[in-house]
């Protein structure tokens, strides 16, 4: 089914910017954080002090105007001040399979947005196959890192950046 934003409008493919608004996790928004001894912040986090947070765009190479639950997607931060804006998942101590930004985008992205309770969740499909891992939150160093986990998914609503 079609992915809808907070006003019931279909989420657009490769066009608009959206906030991911946590459903069950209090206030906060998406941000980038350093992990390990990285020079630049590349780990995607939910930061309670950063709201409404950074905005994302959903992209599928299909020539279609809207996003549905069945599409494999690239997710990227827009606008971005760096070339590293595309979400991917990589092993990162001590988080596990962390969602991080990279400057390389695969033609068909590894994520899908799927309905979950009152909102949506992101599911990571490493080989674009049938089996996916929910993107949840891993609490480390006072931050909530987005990571592919077996635990509770990060559930959010999708709010278009241009809405008041």
Swiss-Prot record:
CDD domains: beta-trefoil_STI_BbKI-like (cd23364). One of its GO terms (molecular function) is cysteine-type endopeptidase inhibitor activity. InterPro entries: Kunitz_inhibitor_STI-like_sf, Prot_inh_Kunz-lg. GO terms for cellular component: extracellular region. Keywords: Protease inhibitor, Secreted, Thiol protease inhibitor. The keyword Secreted applies. It is found in: Secreted. It comes from the Eukaryota. Inhibits T.cruzi cruzipain. Belongs to the protease inhibitor I3 (leguminous Kunitz-type inhibitor) family. This is Kunitz-type proteinase inhibitor BbCI. It comes from Bauhinia bauhinioides. The lineage of its organism: Eukaryota, Viridiplantae, Streptophyta, Embryophyta, Tracheophyta.
